[in-house]
Amino acid sequence: MTQYMPLFRSCSSLRLVSQLHAHLLVTGRLRRDPLPVTKLIESYAFMGSPDSSRLVFEAFPYPDSFMYGVLIKCNVWCHLLDAAIDLYHRLVSETTQISKFVFPSVLRACAGSREHLSVGGKVHGRIIKGGVDDDAVIETSLLCMYGQTGNLSDAEKVFDGMPVRDLVAWSTLVSSCLENGEVVKALRMFKCMVDDGVEPDAVTMISVVEGCAELGCLRIARSVHGQITRKMFDLDETLCNSLLTMYSKCGDLLSSERIFEKIAKKNAVSWTAMISSYNRGEFSEKALRSFSEMIKSGIEPNLVTLYSVLSSCGLIGLIREGKSVHGFAVRRELDPNYESLSLALVELYAECGKLSDCETVLRVVSDRNIVAWNSLISLYAHRGMVIQALGLFRQMVTQRIKPDAFTLASSISACENAGLVPLGKQIHGHVIRTDVSDEFVQNSLIDMYSKSGSVDSASTVFNQIKHRSVVTWNSMLCGFSQNGNSVEAISLFDYMYHSYLEMNEVTFLAVIQACSSIGSLEKGKWVHHKLIISGLKDLFTDTALIDMYAKCGDLNAAETVFRAMSSRSIVSWSSMINAYGMHGRIGSAISTFNQMVESGTKPNEVVFMNVLSACGHSGSVEEGKYYFNLMKSFGVSPNSEHFACFIDLLSRSGDLKEAYRTIKEMPFLADASVWGSLVNGCRIHQKMDIIKAIKNDLSDIVTDDTGYYTLLSNIYAEEGEWEEFRRLRSAMKSSNLKKVPGYSAIEIDQKVFRFGAGEENRIQTDEIYRFLGNLQNLTNEEHVVDS
């Protein structure tokens, strides 16, 4: 047989393999010798003819475990994973003596689909039973299978049990973490690998660089680049392109340009990476110049290049250049039917306002490319062209183009943004009729109903979802919290916590806001404790905690959270200023404002609003005037809220004439909040003459603010101005405005009970009045002791 081995190696075509096969048949070697049979099986598969491999295998009367392994391996080569697994089952049914050579190929077949993970688990069991689980190749194959099917915990168990962890094992685990979106874990594993003395190769470094790009952390990116430089890797085009993309995704375009310049032989991938980097940084003109240089250098662009260039044209409105690029693609027959570039073309025409051209593209690809439809619907929705977005949705249905989950979710979001909830309900009906159970769609429905105030409808959708992800739970949690259903939000969080459901930063953010809105201090502290244990604490949750503690009356806790923050955003500074303001600590509020400015953070409208509010709470008129005038120095123009707060400060101090003069000098018409501040000051200082003097100004106000109408009508009632009282109440009634009833809330053992006037819930009232009775008794006892 040895004389035939060079012949197998020299077979460079399917025809030559067939000729050798015929010769072996004539000589009779295929009937008794398994070696040429296995070589033929491999050769046919290598030439892309797995069916011929199968025929050779079936013709041999006594295939052994090794021959099965060869055919299984060949099926995996040819991506015939089901066939490979079927062969394995057949082998298991025929013999218990399975060669360890079989297992790596079967495990690779199982790695190709999550559906085959259960088979992979059984194969793993047989490997352990057969005592071959210490084989390095098998261990790496197990690692690969669990990693590729998303079962990272089992992959780590296999890895931890390996007596020797070589480069392949480490690289497989790092790649598995990256493929499953666990970028931080992948980088941690890479560090452990280096610390363990295992030298990474170029392939591993490319994976790590791509992970850094996804993470977007420049500090880590530079550290990895330094590792590459120290190890003196050969900076080939692939590694350079990865580094280039990494730096652009981390916001360091200058480093991307430096790496690009170092590439000696720039290919289409290099140029495309640089063009995409410019696009990512919104340097569209540089992207177009790079494309021009690429063409001049004789490098043929690919579809990815053209897609990036079209995006550049769209960003700066160069429609003529965009059409030229598309014409270039058509002339080179790169995209004859708009198939690949349809999405970029739709975005280009939409950005340039050529909506008729968008729809022309849609007509060309309508039967084939639902992505283009979705793109235009999404673009219309984001640009506020909600009617057009919904018109496209209707057009799709009319043309019998089946909307997918993205289409439905985008259309539902469009209805939400336009306040067209009835139309959103119709789409909801379509979702029910077509039995769409996609999580993205269901979450959009919860969001739409929640933001329109229909919390009951949102809750109904939520309760009908069988499998809820953390996003779904968060959508409902935020829905309750944003609509004032804070008790329900806290109850939902408790259920999540005690059911050991997955939580993330958004979960904690929503429940902290719920605790804040009803002043539930004990529950807020408990949530804070659980947040620390979970390791999910971040800038946003810290800022929410500051607000929560301040509103619940624990300023010391708010200060503790603020001081412990490693970094502070403008929202964090603003929240702390607001916290001091709520507690009348004007000196601390101003000191924090000054610290913020010294740290290099420029104050915005919200910061000044909180400073003015702090001045208002403490009655600090002179400070209020100073900071109101200071706004212009920082390029901030006072809006209606700033004026309302400043007028309130002046009015409460009794300086009503100055307040009125300020209103008249406003650069825009004063709204109900501004006039309401002046009216409230007049009520406090019993200046009905001023209210009568500004009666015409007040009657011109049209608003849906029930507080404004209630304040003014109550003043008229106190003064016996019944005609004006009736006029205002009539205006409220005709506008269908109702005063939102107030409520009280009390916290007992971390449980919050809410009640309003006329509350008849006996379970709550009994507990609440029992607690209040105890407080009354304590008060009476203290009074007796004092006397």
UniProtKB/Swiss-Prot annotation:
Record-level GO BP terms: RNA modification
Matching PROSITE patterns: PPR
InterPro entries per the UniProt record, alphabetical: E_motif (IPR046848), Pentatricopeptide_rpt (IPR002885), PPR_At4g14850-like_plant (IPR046960), TPR-like_helical_dom_sf (IPR011990)
Presence of keyword Repeat: yes
Region of interest (Type E motif), residue spans: 674-749
Keywords: Mitochondrion, Repeat, Transit peptide
PANTHER family per UniProt: DYW DOMAIN-CONTAINING PROTEIN (PTHR24015:SF1693), OS07G0578800 PROTEIN-RELATED (PTHR24015)
Name of the protein in question: Putative pentatricopeptide repeat-containing protein At1g69350, mitochondrial
Upper taxonomic lineage: Eukaryota, Viridiplantae, Streptophyta, Embryophyta, Tracheophyta
